Regions:
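Cofactor-binding active-site loop characterized by glycine-rich and histidine/acidic residues
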Residues: 72-84, 88-98, 105-247, 270-271
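Generic beta-sheet signal
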Residues: 134, 221-224, 252, 381-389
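Short internal beta-strands
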Residues: 136-139, 251-259
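Amphipathic alpha-helical packing elements
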Residues: 9-45, 49
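Hydrophobic alpha-helical scaffolding
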Residues: 6-10, 25, 29, 70, ...
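Extended, charge-enriched "interface" segments that sit outside catalytic cores
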Residues: 52, 63-67
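Short, glycine-/Ser/Thr-/acidic-enriched flexible segments
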Residues: 30, 141-143, 151-154, 204-205, ...
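Long, well-ordered, tryptophan-enriched scaffold segments
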Residues: 258-427
Length: 427
Protein backbone atom coordinates (compact mmCIF):
# COMPACT_ATOMS: atom_id res chain seq x y z
CA UNK A 1 0.00 0.00 0.00
CA UNK A 2 2.81 2.45 0.86
CA UNK A 3 4.22 2.28 -2.68
CA UNK A 4 0.95 3.77 -4.00
CA UNK A 5 1.03 6.78 -1.65
CA UNK A 6 2.93 10.01 -2.30
CA UNK A 7 4.10 12.70 0.08
CA UNK A 8 1.89 15.65 -0.86
CA UNK A 9 3.15 17.81 2.04
CA UNK A 10 6.83 17.12 2.93
CA UNK A 11 6.87 19.95 5.48
CA UNK A 12 3.99 18.43 7.45
CA UNK A 13 5.66 15.01 7.23
CA UNK A 14 8.87 16.44 8.67
CA UNK A 15 6.93 18.05 11.52
CA UNK A 16 5.44 14.66 12.46
CA UNK A 17 8.86 12.99 12.29
CA UNK A 18 10.47 15.77 14.32
CA UNK A 19 7.77 15.40 16.96
CA UNK A 20 8.42 11.66 17.20
CA UNK A 21 12.17 12.29 17.37
CA UNK A 22 11.60 14.68 20.26
CA UNK A 23 9.52 12.11 22.15
CA UNK A 24 12.26 9.51 21.66
CA UNK A 25 14.93 11.89 22.90
CA UNK A 26 13.14 13.29 25.94
CA UNK A 27 10.57 10.67 26.95
CA UNK A 28 12.06 7.40 25.71
CA UNK A 29 11.14 4.52 23.44
CA UNK A 30 8.27 3.19 25.60
CA UNK A 31 6.38 6.49 25.33
CA UNK A 32 7.02 6.62 21.59
CA UNK A 33 5.77 3.06 21.21
CA UNK A 34 2.61 3.88 23.17
CA UNK A 35 1.87 6.91 21.00
CA UNK A 36 2.38 4.97 17.77
CA UNK A 37 0.17 2.12 18.94
CA UNK A 38 -2.50 4.66 19.93
CA UNK A 39 -2.31 6.24 16.47
CA UNK A 40 -2.65 2.85 14.79
CA UNK A 41 -5.67 1.96 16.94
CA UNK A 42 -7.30 5.32 16.31
CA UNK A 43 -6.69 5.00 12.56
CA UNK A 44 -8.25 1.55 12.45
CA UNK A 45 -11.24 2.76 14.46
CA UNK A 46 -11.72 5.44 11.79
CA UNK A 47 -11.64 2.83 9.05
CA UNK A 48 -8.21 3.70 7.64
CA UNK A 49 -6.47 0.74 6.04
CA UNK A 50 -3.23 0.23 7.93
CA UNK A 51 -0.15 -1.74 6.91
CA UNK A 52 0.17 -4.76 9.15
CA UNK A 53 3.06 -6.96 10.14
CA UNK A 54 4.27 -9.09 12.99
CA UNK A 55 8.01 -8.55 12.61
CA UNK A 56 10.27 -5.83 13.94
CA UNK A 57 13.64 -4.61 12.59
CA UNK A 58 16.55 -7.05 12.59
CA UNK A 59 17.89 -5.65 15.86
CA UNK A 60 17.94 -6.54 19.54
CA UNK A 61 14.62 -6.11 21.32
CA UNK A 62 16.25 -4.71 24.47
CA UNK A 63 17.92 -1.42 23.56
CA UNK A 64 21.31 -0.41 24.94
CA UNK A 65 19.61 2.35 26.94
CA UNK A 66 17.31 -0.17 28.64
CA UNK A 67 20.00 -2.73 29.47
CA UNK A 68 20.83 -3.64 33.04
CA UNK A 69 24.33 -4.53 34.16
CA UNK A 70 24.87 -8.26 34.59
CA UNK A 71 25.62 -9.04 38.26
CA UNK A 72 28.42 -11.24 39.50
CA UNK A 73 32.10 -11.51 38.60
CA UNK A 74 32.20 -11.86 34.82
CA UNK A 75 35.85 -12.90 34.80
CA UNK A 76 35.07 -15.91 36.98
CA UNK A 77 31.99 -16.78 34.94
CA UNK A 78 34.02 -16.53 31.73
CA UNK A 79 36.63 -18.94 33.11
CA UNK A 80 33.98 -21.45 34.21
CA UNK A 81 32.32 -21.20 30.80
CA UNK A 82 35.66 -21.84 29.08
CA UNK A 83 36.32 -24.97 31.16
CA UNK A 84 32.82 -26.27 30.48
CA UNK A 85 33.31 -25.69 26.74
CA UNK A 86 36.59 -27.60 26.75
CA UNK A 87 35.23 -30.52 28.76
CA UNK A 88 32.13 -30.73 26.56
CA UNK A 89 34.30 -31.12 23.47
CA UNK A 90 36.64 -33.54 25.27
CA UNK A 91 33.74 -35.86 26.19
CA UNK A 92 32.90 -36.43 22.53
CA UNK A 93 36.53 -36.52 21.36
CA UNK A 94 37.49 -39.14 23.97
CA UNK A 95 34.53 -41.30 23.03
CA UNK A 96 35.55 -40.98 19.39
CA UNK A 97 39.04 -42.28 20.18
CA UNK A 98 37.46 -45.54 21.30
CA UNK A 99 35.07 -45.78 18.36
CA UNK A 100 33.79 -43.05 16.05
CA UNK A 101 30.52 -44.95 15.84
CA UNK A 102 29.79 -43.82 19.40
CA UNK A 103 28.95 -40.41 17.95
CA UNK A 104 28.05 -37.31 19.90
CA UNK A 105 27.73 -33.64 19.00
CA UNK A 106 30.38 -30.99 19.65
CA UNK A 107 29.00 -28.02 17.72
CA UNK A 108 25.53 -27.62 19.24
CA UNK A 109 26.65 -26.89 22.80
CA UNK A 110 29.49 -24.64 21.64
CA UNK A 111 26.91 -22.41 19.97
CA UNK A 112 24.67 -22.33 23.05
CA UNK A 113 27.13 -22.41 25.98
CA UNK A 114 26.65 -18.76 26.97
CA UNK A 115 22.87 -19.11 27.06
CA UNK A 116 23.03 -22.11 29.37
CA UNK A 117 25.65 -20.60 31.66
CA UNK A 118 23.72 -17.35 32.10
CA UNK A 119 20.67 -19.42 33.00
CA UNK A 120 22.54 -21.58 35.51
CA UNK A 121 24.33 -18.63 37.12
CA UNK A 122 21.55 -16.06 37.31
CA UNK A 123 18.04 -17.35 36.67
CA UNK A 124 17.23 -21.00 37.27
CA UNK A 125 16.12 -21.96 40.75
CA UNK A 126 16.75 -25.47 41.99
CA UNK A 127 14.43 -27.40 44.22
CA UNK A 128 15.00 -26.39 47.82
CA UNK A 129 13.40 -25.80 51.18
CA UNK A 130 9.82 -24.71 50.59
CA UNK A 131 10.35 -24.33 46.85
CA UNK A 132 10.03 -26.83 44.03
CA UNK A 133 12.22 -24.86 41.64
CA UNK A 134 12.13 -24.25 37.90
CA UNK A 135 11.76 -26.85 35.17
CA UNK A 136 14.22 -26.93 32.26
CA UNK A 137 13.87 -28.82 29.00
CA UNK A 138 17.44 -29.03 27.68
CA UNK A 139 17.95 -29.33 23.95
CA UNK A 140 18.91 -32.93 23.23
CA UNK A 141 22.15 -32.37 21.32
CA UNK A 142 23.76 -30.23 24.06
CA UNK A 143 23.91 -33.09 26.58
CA UNK A 144 27.76 -33.19 26.60
CA UNK A 145 27.82 -29.57 27.77
CA UNK A 146 25.42 -30.21 30.64
CA UNK A 147 27.49 -33.23 31.68
CA UNK A 148 30.63 -31.08 31.48
CA UNK A 149 29.17 -28.50 33.84
CA UNK A 150 28.05 -31.20 36.25
CA UNK A 151 31.63 -32.51 36.29
CA UNK A 152 32.96 -29.04 37.19
CA UNK A 153 30.38 -28.95 40.00
CA UNK A 154 31.51 -32.36 41.25
CA UNK A 155 28.19 -34.04 40.44
CA UNK A 156 29.63 -36.44 37.86
CA UNK A 157 32.94 -38.30 37.87
CA UNK A 158 35.62 -38.47 35.18
CA UNK A 159 34.88 -42.17 34.87
CA UNK A 160 31.29 -41.38 33.94
CA UNK A 161 32.40 -38.81 31.37
CA UNK A 162 34.81 -41.31 29.87
CA UNK A 163 31.87 -43.67 29.35
CA UNK A 164 29.68 -41.26 27.41
CA UNK A 165 27.29 -43.30 25.26
CA UNK A 166 28.68 -46.52 26.83
CA UNK A 167 26.07 -47.63 29.33
CA UNK A 168 26.23 -51.41 29.26
CA UNK A 169 28.19 -51.75 32.50
CA UNK A 170 26.03 -49.19 34.29
CA UNK A 171 28.70 -46.48 34.59
CA UNK A 172 28.04 -44.58 31.37
CA UNK A 173 26.04 -41.51 30.41
CA UNK A 174 23.17 -41.54 27.90
CA UNK A 175 23.51 -39.67 24.63
CA UNK A 176 20.61 -37.32 25.29
CA UNK A 177 18.47 -36.12 28.23
CA UNK A 178 16.88 -39.32 29.50
CA UNK A 179 15.23 -39.39 32.96
CA UNK A 180 14.70 -43.15 32.82
CA UNK A 181 18.39 -43.89 32.28
CA UNK A 182 19.66 -41.08 34.54
CA UNK A 183 16.76 -40.29 36.90
CA UNK A 184 18.76 -38.17 39.37
CA UNK A 185 20.06 -35.90 36.62
CA UNK A 186 17.55 -35.15 33.86
CA UNK A 187 14.04 -33.78 34.44
CA UNK A 188 12.62 -34.42 30.95
CA UNK A 189 13.46 -36.32 27.75
CA UNK A 190 13.76 -33.99 24.75
CA UNK A 191 14.64 -36.34 21.90
CA UNK A 192 13.28 -36.88 19.30
CA UNK A 193 13.36 -33.29 18.15
CA UNK A 194 10.14 -31.37 18.67
CA UNK A 195 9.02 -33.25 21.77
CA UNK A 196 10.58 -30.76 24.19
CA UNK A 197 8.67 -27.66 23.01
CA UNK A 198 5.36 -29.52 22.89
CA UNK A 199 5.73 -31.13 26.33
CA UNK A 200 6.91 -27.87 27.88
CA UNK A 201 3.73 -26.07 26.84
CA UNK A 202 1.54 -28.67 28.51
CA UNK A 203 3.85 -28.81 31.54
CA UNK A 204 3.47 -25.04 32.00
CA UNK A 205 -0.29 -25.38 31.61
CA UNK A 206 -0.37 -28.16 34.21
CA UNK A 207 1.49 -25.96 36.71
CA UNK A 208 -1.18 -23.29 36.22
CA UNK A 209 -3.87 -25.95 36.70
CA UNK A 210 -2.35 -27.14 39.99
CA UNK A 211 -2.19 -23.58 41.33
CA UNK A 212 -5.72 -22.64 40.26
CA UNK A 213 -7.19 -25.80 41.83
CA UNK A 214 -5.31 -25.28 45.08
CA UNK A 215 -3.44 -28.55 44.65
CA UNK A 216 0.07 -27.08 44.74
CA UNK A 217 1.80 -23.73 44.98
CA UNK A 218 3.42 -23.21 41.60
CA UNK A 219 3.41 -19.41 41.37
CA UNK A 220 6.87 -18.10 40.54
CA UNK A 221 8.05 -21.34 38.94
CA UNK A 222 9.15 -21.09 35.32
CA UNK A 223 9.28 -23.67 32.57
CA UNK A 224 12.26 -23.11 30.28
CA UNK A 225 12.64 -24.97 27.02
CA UNK A 226 15.71 -24.84 24.79
CA UNK A 227 15.47 -25.81 21.16
CA UNK A 228 17.17 -25.24 17.84
CA UNK A 229 16.01 -23.18 14.89
CA UNK A 230 16.02 -26.26 12.66
CA UNK A 231 14.03 -28.12 15.31
CA UNK A 232 11.24 -25.57 14.92
CA UNK A 233 10.35 -27.16 11.58
CA UNK A 234 9.21 -30.27 13.43
CA UNK A 235 5.39 -30.13 13.47
CA UNK A 236 5.29 -30.62 17.24
CA UNK A 237 7.55 -27.62 17.93
CA UNK A 238 5.06 -24.95 16.93
CA UNK A 239 1.91 -27.05 16.90
CA UNK A 240 0.62 -25.82 20.28
CA UNK A 241 2.02 -22.29 20.53
CA UNK A 242 -1.44 -20.75 20.13
CA UNK A 243 -2.64 -22.74 23.15
CA UNK A 244 0.21 -21.29 25.23
CA UNK A 245 -0.91 -17.71 24.62
CA UNK A 246 -4.60 -18.56 24.83
CA UNK A 247 -4.04 -20.09 28.28
CA UNK A 248 -1.96 -17.13 29.45
CA UNK A 249 1.15 -19.20 30.16
CA UNK A 250 3.40 -16.41 31.39
CA UNK A 251 5.35 -19.08 33.28
CA UNK A 252 6.75 -20.39 29.98
CA UNK A 253 9.98 -19.30 28.26
CA UNK A 254 11.19 -20.69 24.94
CA UNK A 255 14.86 -20.08 24.09
CA UNK A 256 15.55 -20.83 20.44
CA UNK A 257 19.21 -21.14 19.51
CA UNK A 258 19.29 -19.60 16.02
CA UNK A 259 22.68 -20.78 14.78
CA UNK A 260 21.20 -20.91 11.25
CA UNK A 261 22.11 -24.59 10.73
CA UNK A 262 20.25 -27.86 10.99
CA UNK A 263 21.41 -31.47 10.77
CA UNK A 264 22.33 -31.30 7.11
CA UNK A 265 22.83 -27.66 6.15
CA UNK A 266 21.28 -24.19 6.43
CA UNK A 267 17.92 -23.70 8.12
CA UNK A 268 16.87 -20.82 5.84
CA UNK A 269 19.77 -20.12 3.51
CA UNK A 270 17.68 -17.80 1.34
CA UNK A 271 15.59 -16.36 4.16
CA UNK A 272 15.81 -15.15 7.75
CA UNK A 273 14.72 -17.71 10.33
CA UNK A 274 14.66 -15.20 13.20
CA UNK A 275 12.22 -12.96 11.35
CA UNK A 276 10.10 -15.94 10.33
CA UNK A 277 9.89 -17.26 13.88
CA UNK A 278 9.17 -13.79 15.24
CA UNK A 279 6.21 -13.54 12.89
CA UNK A 280 4.91 -16.97 13.88
CA UNK A 281 5.16 -16.42 17.64
CA UNK A 282 4.05 -12.78 17.65
CA UNK A 283 1.07 -13.75 15.50
CA UNK A 284 0.21 -16.44 18.04
CA UNK A 285 0.24 -13.89 20.86
CA UNK A 286 3.68 -14.42 22.42
CA UNK A 287 6.18 -11.87 23.68
CA UNK A 288 9.19 -12.00 21.36
CA UNK A 289 12.68 -10.99 22.51
CA UNK A 290 15.39 -10.95 19.85
CA UNK A 291 19.08 -11.20 20.78
CA UNK A 292 20.89 -10.76 17.48
CA UNK A 293 23.91 -8.49 17.99
CA UNK A 294 26.54 -8.54 20.74
CA UNK A 295 27.99 -5.51 22.53
CA UNK A 296 30.79 -5.05 20.00
CA UNK A 297 28.18 -3.87 17.49
CA UNK A 298 26.82 -1.19 19.84
CA UNK A 299 29.38 1.44 18.87
CA UNK A 300 28.79 0.91 15.15
CA UNK A 301 25.02 1.08 15.55
CA UNK A 302 25.38 4.31 17.55
CA UNK A 303 27.46 5.78 14.69
CA UNK A 304 24.89 4.67 12.10
CA UNK A 305 23.02 7.98 11.94
CA UNK A 306 21.68 7.39 8.41
CA UNK A 307 20.54 3.80 8.99
CA UNK A 308 22.82 2.28 6.34
CA UNK A 309 24.13 -0.40 8.71
CA UNK A 310 20.62 -1.32 9.84
CA UNK A 311 19.56 -1.54 6.20
CA UNK A 312 22.48 -3.86 5.45
CA UNK A 313 21.65 -6.05 8.45
CA UNK A 314 18.09 -6.30 7.19
CA UNK A 315 18.91 -7.19 3.58
CA UNK A 316 21.51 -9.89 4.29
CA UNK A 317 20.15 -13.44 4.30
CA UNK A 318 21.01 -16.24 6.69
CA UNK A 319 23.16 -17.92 4.04
CA UNK A 320 25.23 -14.73 3.85
CA UNK A 321 25.63 -14.55 7.62
CA UNK A 322 26.73 -18.18 7.78
CA UNK A 323 29.28 -17.60 5.02
CA UNK A 324 30.76 -14.59 6.82
CA UNK A 325 31.44 -16.65 9.93
CA UNK A 326 33.13 -19.41 7.94
CA UNK A 327 35.66 -16.91 6.51
CA UNK A 328 37.64 -14.10 8.20
CA UNK A 329 37.59 -10.40 9.01
CA UNK A 330 38.93 -9.31 5.63
CA UNK A 331 36.12 -11.21 3.90
CA UNK A 332 33.52 -9.60 6.18
CA UNK A 333 34.93 -6.14 5.47
CA UNK A 334 34.76 -6.76 1.72
CA UNK A 335 31.38 -8.48 1.49
CA UNK A 336 29.27 -7.27 4.44
CA UNK A 337 30.57 -3.71 4.60
CA UNK A 338 30.25 -3.61 0.83
CA UNK A 339 29.69 0.06 0.01
CA UNK A 340 31.94 3.11 0.46
CA UNK A 341 29.63 4.39 3.21
CA UNK A 342 29.72 1.09 5.12
CA UNK A 343 33.48 0.76 4.67
CA UNK A 344 33.90 4.25 6.12
CA UNK A 345 31.94 3.10 9.17
CA UNK A 346 34.65 0.52 9.97
CA UNK A 347 37.65 2.38 8.55
CA UNK A 348 39.19 2.69 12.03
CA UNK A 349 38.84 -1.04 12.73
CA UNK A 350 41.33 -3.80 11.95
CA UNK A 351 40.27 -7.02 10.26
CA UNK A 352 40.68 -8.74 13.63
CA UNK A 353 38.31 -6.27 15.28
CA UNK A 354 35.76 -6.75 12.52
CA UNK A 355 36.05 -10.52 12.94
CA UNK A 356 35.44 -10.10 16.69
CA UNK A 357 32.06 -8.39 16.13
CA UNK A 358 29.95 -10.84 18.09
CA UNK A 359 26.48 -12.28 17.86
CA UNK A 360 23.98 -11.72 20.63
CA UNK A 361 23.75 -15.32 21.81
CA UNK A 362 27.48 -15.31 22.64
CA UNK A 363 27.31 -12.12 24.72
CA UNK A 364 26.40 -12.77 28.38
CA UNK A 365 25.28 -9.15 28.88
CA UNK A 366 22.79 -9.36 26.00
CA UNK A 367 21.57 -12.82 27.02
CA UNK A 368 21.13 -11.73 30.63
CA UNK A 369 18.92 -8.82 29.60
CA UNK A 370 16.81 -11.02 27.35
CA UNK A 371 16.26 -13.49 30.20
CA UNK A 372 15.52 -10.65 32.60
CA UNK A 373 12.90 -9.31 30.20
CA UNK A 374 11.35 -12.80 29.95
CA UNK A 375 11.04 -13.44 33.68
CA UNK A 376 9.91 -9.96 34.70
CA UNK A 377 7.19 -9.21 32.19
CA UNK A 378 3.67 -9.22 33.62
CA UNK A 379 1.28 -9.25 30.69
CA UNK A 380 0.02 -12.82 30.89
CA UNK A 381 1.85 -14.01 27.78
CA UNK A 382 4.50 -16.68 27.18
CA UNK A 383 7.87 -15.45 25.94
CA UNK A 384 10.15 -16.68 23.18
CA UNK A 385 13.79 -15.59 23.00
CA UNK A 386 15.38 -15.76 19.55
CA UNK A 387 19.16 -15.76 20.04
CA UNK A 388 21.53 -15.62 17.09
CA UNK A 389 24.69 -17.71 17.45
CA UNK A 390 27.35 -19.51 15.42
CA UNK A 391 27.20 -23.29 15.04
CA UNK A 392 30.47 -24.78 16.23
CA UNK A 393 31.59 -21.54 17.90
CA UNK A 394 35.30 -21.86 18.69
CA UNK A 395 35.88 -25.02 16.61
CA UNK A 396 37.77 -23.21 13.85
CA UNK A 397 38.31 -25.12 10.63
CA UNK A 398 36.87 -28.27 12.22
CA UNK A 399 33.36 -26.88 12.28
CA UNK A 400 32.81 -23.19 13.02
CA UNK A 401 30.11 -21.96 10.66
CA UNK A 402 30.57 -25.02 8.43
CA UNK A 403 27.70 -27.08 7.02
CA UNK A 404 29.36 -30.19 8.45
CA UNK A 405 29.39 -28.75 11.99
CA UNK A 406 26.44 -30.70 13.37
CA UNK A 407 27.93 -34.06 12.44
CA UNK A 408 31.47 -33.21 13.58
CA UNK A 409 32.75 -35.87 15.99
CA UNK A 410 36.43 -34.95 15.94
CA UNK A 411 38.75 -31.95 15.72
CA UNK A 412 42.19 -31.90 14.16
CA UNK A 413 45.17 -30.93 16.30
CA UNK A 414 45.44 -27.42 14.86
CA UNK A 415 41.77 -26.68 15.58
CA UNK A 416 42.08 -28.10 19.08
CA UNK A 417 45.08 -25.88 19.82
CA UNK A 418 43.22 -22.89 18.42
CA UNK A 419 40.23 -23.76 20.64
CA UNK A 420 42.54 -24.04 23.66
CA UNK A 421 44.18 -20.67 22.99
CA UNK A 422 40.92 -18.89 22.16
CA UNK A 423 39.39 -19.79 25.51
CA UNK A 424 42.69 -19.71 27.44
CA UNK A 425 42.52 -23.32 28.63
CA UNK A 426 45.58 -24.20 30.77
CA UNK A 427 46.51 -27.49 29.05
Amino acid sequence: MSTQLHDVDPIETKEWLDALSSVLEYEGSERAQYLLESLVKYSRDKGIRMPHGTTTPYLNTVSVEDEKGIPGDQNIEHRIRAFVRWNAAAIVLRAGKKDLELGGHIASFQSAATMYEVGFNHFWKAKGEGEEGDLVFFQGHVAPGIYARAFVEGRLTEDQLNNFRQEVDGKGLPSYPHPHLLPDFWQFPTVSMGLGPLMAIYQARFLKYLESRGLAKTKGRKVWVFCGDGEMDEPESQGAIALASREGLDNLVFVINCNLQRLDGPVRGNGKIIQELEGNFAGAGWNVVKVIWGRRWDRLLAKDKDGILRKRMEECLDGDYQTYKSKDGAYVREHFFNTPELKALVADMTDEQIWALNRGGHDPQKVYNAYDRAVNHADGKPTVILAKTIKGYGMGASGEGQNVAHQAKKMDKASLKQFRDRFDIPV
